Amino acid sequence: CYPENAPRYISDILTCSMTMYFQSRHEAGEQLAVQLFEKYRYENTAVVALSDGAVAVGEPIAAKLHCVLTMLVSEDVAIPGEGQSLGAVSQEGTFTYSSELEASEIREYNTEFHGYFEEKKREAFHKINNLIGDGGIIDHDMLRERTVILISDGLSDITPLDVALDFLKPVKLARLVIAAPVASVDVVDRVHMVADELHILDVKANYLGTDHYYEQNDLPTHEQTIAKINQIILNWR
């Protein structure tokens, strides 16, 4: 079930099913929950979603593990005319450059588009603050000494993981697990060294866009997702 050009280690570290398409993100999350339950049902665990769609995947996982579900909100900053991400702003206001870019590329883009990028960063941070308020919906204390499971509904781009890893740098974790129903070979190749464990149901050589792999794409709005996460955290505390 792995692409022919996938690195050899993929078959050793990933649990892959023959499923290429999922009925919904919830159903994909249930499949991941079965895998994660076997290893982490007795662990002190936190599930951290990386997007709205990831919350839908993460809900059945958190329910199965009886653990908190939260979300790391970030806003992407794109490079004009390139169809590529420069990086993303986190809820703390920190900007993380995409690890797909070389240092020389970053310098070149910053020289050419400095004013544009600074404005987009301010807009991104303002948008995040409007959504989640000053307190945010995730903090370091919530994750310290826990097994943290980073959840995505589809890993086609490394940037959300770059932001998450940057956010987690000052936090002492028990383990770091990255899980997703589907991921591109390129992303898996980049992240397998930073996680203690990966759980990916399907690895794609030619990633067609996350929505393509789900029959149902009727997600709540960003505002509804944030409200849901806030309620989950309040109930958990």
Q: Could you describe each region identified by the protein language model?
A:
Residues 1-237:
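PRPP-associated nucleotide enzymes
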